[in-house]
Amino acid sequence: MAEIQWHTVFEALLSPCETNRPTKSGSSAQSLHDYIMTSKELPSSGCDDCPVHLAGNLFKLGVDMKDWDFVVALAGNPNVGKSTVFNALTGLRQHTGNWPGKTVARAEGGYEFRDKRFKLVDLPGTYSLLSTTEDEEIARDFLLFGRPDVTVVVVDANRLERNLNLALQVLEITDRVVICLNLMDEARRHGLEVDERRLARDLGVPVVPTSARYDEGLEELVHTIDQVATGKIECKPHRIEYLSRGLKEAVSELTSDIEEQFPGLPNSRWVALRLLDGDTRMRNAVQSGELGELARQVESGAQVGAAA
């Protein structure tokens, strides 16, 4: 089975939902450049509905958490400011341990917003969820089996194409996603702005611009996380139909077999896709029967927390 070409999926997603809507030049928008424009080209867009004065509702808990209402996964490529976002929300403190059975460090903390407590799990920085490294495997397994209430994907506003590859893969696993469009300060220094509203429309999930190092946009970020976690914002990701009829049938049949062998396993369709794509680790986990135990272990870790 041929490997899924994620860059092809990405290019398709970058085409606007209204494919006949003309750009300034009169042609249909088809590329990443439709999201990025110079500061002079960007139209002013005041937003009366944007959350303001929310800082007073945010309480940084660090690791002082005996229980929580929601689990939030923080995912992203390396060097996108993910740890800066984590530290800004949790109060510059991390609870560091190891992932179960792994040597990779795990950091988690928490914050309280509007009387609700959020546990934030900082996943290893990774470019993909296709599980070719231990970091990718950890991030993938947590998103597949940890059942986070919300997944925040931190992306670099200056390198959207590279970063949105991971975001697209996350959207294949879960609907409850918020895109944190970070490093907006650097984008401005380069004379660039990102049309986050259009990006949100085309992805089907909220997009929040931030500059975490300067605490810009974090109030809106926690507000949006809260809205998604409580169901006040319903995410409807625009997934690309990139599977052929034959592949769809194979995925459907294999998904049914997986669900029969591992009752209650979340995201069985993604597992089927990885098996068809030749994922050796996933295949071994299915053949040995370890997949069910892995799912239980990851879900338990999400609820209990990292070891001290």
Model-derived regions: residue spans:
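Canonical P-loop GTPase G-domain recognition
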Residues: 187-239
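Helical mechanochemical/support elements of P-loop NTPase systems and associated helical scaffolds
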Residues: 100-104, 119, 131, 135-138, ...
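Extended helical scaffolds that flank P-loop GTPase cores
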Residues: 5, 50, 234-308
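Conserved nucleotide-binding/hydrolysis micro-motifs of P-loop NTPases
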Residues: 101, 125-126, 157-161, 183-188, ...
